[in-house]
Amino acid sequence: QKSFRAEDIEEVGDNRHTTFFEMLGNWSLGDYFKKEQLRWFFEFLTEEVGLSPEHLYVTVFIGDEKAGVLKDTESAQIWKQLFKEKGVDAKEVEIGSESDGYIKGMQDGRIFFYDDKKNWWNRGKPSLKTTPIGDPAGPDSEVFYDFRTPHNKAFGKECHPNCDCGRFM
């Protein structure tokens, strides 16, 4: 879908933000769920587009005990299986916040658990706190491509999939 975003206009010009782009979305209300959706997306990236699975890294929601929202272990297990089918080991790493990522780093991981600022979808600014009651919202999963460029420590001590150094998109 064609997307124009102005909510993060102040970030345009960094390694990841533009105002207009085409976004691949995969939405369903009851027709299919994580198992099918994640497989279709992985197959699209690796078989149709031809991306090497060794260059792909994924993020999932870490959960929020206070809000009563569980860690998305289901998506992590699906991703683990998909990578295994391609011969790629998929270690899980709990990051938490983006700032935690600059301390914890990659740790040889492939599947990373982030908080609601990174892996929670809603119609507004991503966060459990900004989600209006009754609105469609929930944990999401994102895929990052590793360009294998050296980490620029000006962005933080350690690199991680949500790092802005340019290694991942």
Language model: regions and residue ranges:
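Structured aminoacyl-transfer and RNA-binding surfaces used for tRNA recognition/handling
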Residues: 1-169
